[in-house]
Amino acid sequence: TYTLGRGTDGRIGLAYKNNDGTQPGDYGDVWFMESVNNGTTFGVPVKIYDADFGPSGDSLGCIRGISMTYKGNAPAVAFETVKQTQEGSFFPGLPARIRFWSNTLPGADPNRSVVVADTSNVGYHPYIGVNDVLSSLGRPNIGVSSNGNALFIAFMVPSDEVGGAADTTTFSDIWLAGSIDGGFTWPQLGKLNPATPIKDWRYVSVSKWNDN
């Protein structure tokens, strides 16, 4: 899984989930690399998230959800981290997180990213039903305001409603998080869709740029 973005000066960023087949030692990790010559060549990949599968680790790693844009010439990456094993299993009913990374955040990689959303601010809603490779939080999509002052991340959160006779599955809600300090904090957070009528809100997308 990968995502592309373009900076103000034309630089191209590529953020991607680790290829667990060819690099099993970096299972569930997230990488970023950048090109300043229109994609002809890219710099050395930088690990921006290091999944911890050790005895005391949380075993949260990226599965599919990753999105990026640029805030000026600063990359801005949103990604999901889901409870999983290095043998290929994941747990849609367990707590997950939405994270944000930029090279303008304090600290050093791969420990620079911050948590945007988890069970502490959106509640715990396990995903049940058909295997859509979804979890209790997932599929983030990121955008930036036209003046470059604000970042927005929209993502999916399972609701407390289920439906379907043959394969009962959780309905999903769409949540939106906002930041005005370059992604260091995300104090603006709320559900976008109405409570009624009950519908399955999925796969949200945020415009990378917005002139209004």
Question: For the regions a protein language model found, what residue spans apply to each?
Answer:
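Extracellular, repeat-based ectodomains that mediate carbohydrate processing or recognition
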Residues: 1-212
